[in-house]
């Protein structure tokens, strides 16, 4: 009786099953990594847009309380800006206010690029604005 050399059909099937399982796990990892890279790219671009939007506030037009909104990159990023006087918690409410004194404004910028809660950035900053920059004569 001769001994057969080679692999049996069951051994080949088991090898293919293990290979398929390994490829499935590998592709799942690559898919997750690609999703994380895409999310990091969107977050980085949103941060750059937010910095640019905040940098130009008060440059072309005087900074006044109100709301603005818009979109960037063909609507991929949507932003809204809320400008309001800063409410100083330690300020005495009865203290007289000099109309020619500079005003502190709080800018709240929200940049969104999706519907998920982690697909938005919220920036808050303060700007000191002179009375003449607000349109009030000094």
Curated annotation (Swiss-Prot):
It is a single-pass membrane protein. PROSITE patterns: PROKAR_NTER_METHYL (PS00409). Keywords: Cell inner membrane, Cell membrane, Membrane, Methylation, Protein transport, Transmembrane, Transmembrane helix, Transport. GO terms for biological process: protein secretion by the type II secretion system. InterPro entries: N_methyl_site (IPR012902), T2SS_protein-GspI (IPR010052). Residues 1-6 form a propeptide. The keyword Transport applies. GO terms for cellular component: plasma membrane; type II protein secretion system complex. The modification N-methyltyrosine is found at residue 7. The chain crosses the membrane at residues 7-29. Cleaved by prepilin peptidase. The keyword Metal-binding does not apply. It is found in: Cell inner membrane. Component of the type II secretion system required for the energy-dependent secretion of extracellular factors such as proteases and toxins from the periplasm. Part of the pseudopilus tip complex that is critical for the recognition and binding of secretion substrates. Type II secretion is composed of four main components: the outer membrane complex, the inner membrane complex, the cytoplasmic secretion ATPase and the periplasm-spanning pseudopilus. Interacts with core component XpsG. Belongs to the GSP I family. This is Type II secretion system protein I. It comes from Xanthomonas campestris pv. campestris (strain ATCC 33913 / DSM 3586 / NCPPB 528 / LMG 568 / P 25). The gene is xpsI.
